[in-house]
Amino acid sequence: MSLNVYFNAAPLLSPKTGIGQYCLNLMSELENISGVDPHYFYGGVWSDELLRQAPTSVSATKKFKRTVAQVIPDLAYGLQQRWRGRHFCKGIASTASAVYHEPNFLAFNTPLPTVVTVHDLSILRYPETHPRDRVSFMTRRLGESIRRADCVISDSEYGRQEILAEYNLPPERVVSVLLAAGSGFSPVAAEQLPALLAPFDLQSGQYVLSVGTLEPRKNLTTAIKAYARLPEAIRQEIPFVIAGMKGWRTDGLDREVAALIEKGQIRRLGYVPDEALPGLYSGARVFVYPSLYEGFGLPPLEAMACGAPVIVSNRSSLPEVVGDAGLQVDALDVDGLAEAMNRLIGDDVLRASLRQRGMERAKGFSWRRCAEETLAVYRKVVTG
């Protein structure tokens, strides 16, 4: 008998962030495993197809969201959740072989055995890096979602330990299932890079790169301050390239980069589609990711898979992901980060070593294994 997996696929609606990538890669692998029958919920629309773009009928959900959000933000979150929950429950069949997987923190209240993926606890650890209305809503609802779940999945062992400590759960109720870089993330051949980088006006090996949504938690301000302390000659030759869509509270970042943008030393690319990222990673002289807090941290792993030497902060899950395959610095140590960037930019031998070690480490992470371990969680909660 097939296992029916009811999956809230709303994070797949473009543009996809890290959670959207998690959904797409996990479900793509699960579809290739026999005995799994997936069903996808797209914010009010059910489908048995794994969609890579938003269906047009989702526009009604977006209109509803905009309308209620104009009233009271906290109320808007609650109304959206209840409205979607009702539509979700209309499409499920409660059988002896069915499970509901919520990949994005807050589970609907359903009669099915429930698995929730909690990617991080940044809403509790760094509330100042989130909008106030989101903090208010999530702080109250996240605990309810976690306690309601039959099993909680964390992206890392670091995250698992945080959840266990915060919510005082039995160890068997929380499982760490590591993520991976997508199959498209691999080194791009040197002869192909000029054409791939031309739309961004970049040359292979001649830029420092950072990728991620622009928001306070990503700590790009520290990275920019560190870059600004590099010798002028380096900055004139090797710009700092920032790829990622705007999140919130970017005014400080905008002020920080204005002068360097004017000099051409910082390039902001905005949102970069998934298919363009391997080329960007492969051509980077150095990849920098000084995040204050991550539940996993996909961009450094993607960068390593593409052969970019990486520098990350030594906080949260990032040491677990990168290990000794990259340089680690304190997230708020501007001088330390500047020193690491300067060293890696100028040391050909170190870059080559980290490039090789990074590619080898990235091979140890697999979406197939992620899917198999997630499926084991499904079967565990279904059988009780």
Predicted regions: what they are:
Residues 1-384:
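Carbohydrate transferase catalytic cores enriched for Leloir-type hexosyltransferases
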